[in-house]
Amino acid sequence: MKLFDYAPLSLAWREFLQSEFKKPYFLEIEKRYLEALKSPKTIFPKSSNLFCAFNLTPPYAVKIILLGQDPYHSTYLENEQELPVAMGLSFSVEKNAPIPPSLKNIFKELHANLGVPVPCCGDLSAWAKRGMLLLNAILSVEKNQAASHKYIGWEAFSDQILIRLFETTTPLIVVLLGKVAQKKIALIPKNKHIIITAPHPSPLSRGFLGSGVFTSVQKAYREVYRKDFDFSL
């Protein structure tokens, strides 16, 4: 079986990225990921959610990109069943999962900047459906092992996705939180897209709270689209 048999990807993205899927680097990603899936190890997110960010935000609908690093590797209990927190969107978690510290800080800053009520749920699917691509640079992870799938090669794929998206004529708003994400600035054509940077929202990082990052995002969105982005959840 092929990757897309385990991890469905929308037709719009298959067409947008069709040339990538034939390249040796992607065939190697596919091989390594499928080997990991078939191993005794538990892989997050569920394979059916691997391409959730793409399936909720078609390439022609992308207006904002919020780049994450790799999926949450933790679990939570629901009805005595252990379930993955990760659900295929950067920073987002399953509807009934506890809200992680980084996402709590995102919600705090969003409330401080724009007055958006702090949600009781950490599922950001609504943002994705409104045109925010919630993309992790690395798309999968082994349970309880942060950055364990760096070896698979996902970053080469996510870089190509960004490069292809940056070819668009409409300015994209690219939100890069933390030093790892900010390395992607090198991929962005100068004077074409709007780059917004801030420290990572992790409590281990300093400077995110009070950065005004969402004020900057909303200002940029108004400049490009003449309306506000709806951050409500």
Curated annotation (Swiss-Prot):
Keywords, alphabetical: Cytoplasm, DNA damage, DNA repair, Hydrolase
Coiled coil region boundaries: none
GO biological process: base-excision repair, AP site formation via deaminated base removal
Cellular component, GO annotation: cytoplasm
EC class (word): hydrolase
Family per similarity comment: Belongs to the uracil-DNA glycosylase (UDG) superfamily. UNG family.
Function: Excises uracil residues from the DNA which can arise as a result of misincorporation of dUMP residues by DNA polymerase or due to deamination of cytosine.
Full protein name: Uracil-DNA glycosylase
Gene source species: Helicobacter pylori (strain J99 / ATCC 700824)
